[in-house]
Amino acid sequence: MENQKKNNFNQIDYFRWADYSKNNNNNNNNNNNNNINNNNNNNNNNNINNNIDNNNSFYRFISPPFNKINNNNNANNFNNINNNNNNNFNNYQLNDGNKISINNILNDNTTTTNTSANQNSANTNKTYNFSKNENGIVYEIDNFILDSNLVREQPFNNFNYLNIINNIQNFLQLISGKVNLLNVILGILVDDVNRYSVNPNSMSIIPSDNFPTPQLPLETNTDLNNTSDCSSTTFSSPPSSAFNSPNLQNDYTQPQNQKSQSSTIVKKNSSKSKSKNNKQSKDDGETNDGESPEIEEKRVIRLDMNLNPNPTIPKRGRPLKVRPFECSICKIKCSIYWRRILINEVRTSVCNACGLRTMKKTKKENIEKKKNKISNILNDHNSEIDNQIIIYLNQKKTTTTTTTTTTSSTNNLNNNNNNNNNNNNNNNNNNNNNNNNNNNDNNNNDNNNNDNNNNDNNNNNNNNNNNNNNNNNNNNNDNYNDSIYSRLYSDDYEDEYYEGEEYENEDE
């Protein structure tokens, strides 16, 4: 199938046989009429096909399934091609055995040539009328009937559509009349194709005089020298009813400003959408006045033939705003209509172009990830703290050996002092008791003095204990005093810390 954009063809609605002798003679010397032999017909036909592809031809070649009657099994070769001005096709037949002989297709100024077709089965004749156009040598075939069953039985490889018309100068430009032809690409038989002829000088379509002219919007190019504009002639695509209608002309009579039904619904107020509308209006056969049909503003739904034309859109979910987004599969950079749906507590977005579902994260997943991050940070921090505690405990084991000796010595001294004081107090009490009978006032004074002495001794002991604690704290690391975690994890420091608080509370 030829490229649709390159050749400006929407559908195969006209079938034409054209003259390629000029292009073939200019492009490939092997394609000259004087050099054709029965031995190298296949090579010449291949060369012709290559030349036509290089020239970007916009013709469709549909030919009847003629098979040659000779000993050669190759059905793609010619039989009895003469190099004179009178070119003869001899001994061709249809698949059912009906012979067709086409003789004396002249290149002079004669208007008509009658040929006959012999049928072995029914012994009847078919008349093929060939005529010339005033603007050029254009031959027309009238009442040419091709059985669709025979066409379907014929293999596709045997259809060499150029064989009947190659290397014959100005042979047939167009098949016309009532023809049943096989639409090879779409597989549809087209009925009642109206007669047309082509002017080879201007490459424009000239309707026949005997048939009415359908109203078709056409673009013609009168410049024959510009080979790059070979695809300038465009045709509007026929409606779907044209393939099954008995009268093709009535179906083709359409208003030129008819709205086109396109698969892409474009929003207003955008320069890109306007350019797309103009291109679509030219392809759909609208007028070139710049008047684009009014299209209702709807959400953009992109439906391409290469993608899923009917995407499944979930019923649940709320519609999102139209936003520019590039799908990961269909790679469409446009505003795609997305829908968000909650499936198994996972949010998904559905692309209407290809039906792709992109998974999105829920809040629960995000919260779990945040928790994991926090726990990882805490674990790292706790590991550092544990390391500090281990270092502290190791240091404490080394320092307690020195501090305990000092504290024990001081405690012993304090205890000795206390004992001495107690002994002194007892002595004083004894003395006081002995003196009670004599002087009550003196006893009271003595008791008061003893109490004061005891309080002083207690204060001295407390001061000694506080000094020892301060010495221990100064000998340890600063982390021991500053770190909150060390107070929580170390039992030794916890006991000392609360003991110190108890002593301080007693002093207060």
Curated annotation (Swiss-Prot):
Q: Where is the composition biased (Polar residues)?
A: 203-224, 248-266
**Gene3D superfamilies, alphabetized:** Erythroid Transcription Factor GATA-1, subunit A (3.30.50.10)
Q: Where are the zinc fingers (GATA-type)?
A: 327-354
> In what ranges is there compositional bias, type Basic residues?
269-279
What are the recorded GO MF terms, alphabetically? sequence-specific DNA binding; zinc ion binding
Report the SMART domains cross-referenced here. Answer: ZnF_GATA
The source's superkingdom equals Eukaryota
The record's listing under InterPro entries reads: Znf_GATA, Znf_NHR/GATA
Keywords recorded for this protein, A-Z? Coiled coil, Metal-binding, Zinc, Zinc-finger
Q: Region (Disordered): which ranges?
A: 20-51, 203-296, 399-484
Q: Where is the composition biased (Low complexity)?
A: 23-51, 225-247, 399-482
Coiled-coil region(s) at which residues?
Answer: 356-433
The processes (GO biological process) annotated in the record are: adenylate cyclase-activating G protein-coupled cAMP receptor signaling pathway; regulation of DNA-templated transcription
Q: What's the protein called, per UniProt?
A: GATA zinc finger domain-containing protein 13
Task: Tell me the organism.
Answer: Dictyostelium discoideum (Social amoeba)
Which lineage do the record's taxonomy fields give for this organism?
Answer: Eukaryota, Amoebozoa, Evosea, Eumycetozoa, Dictyostelia
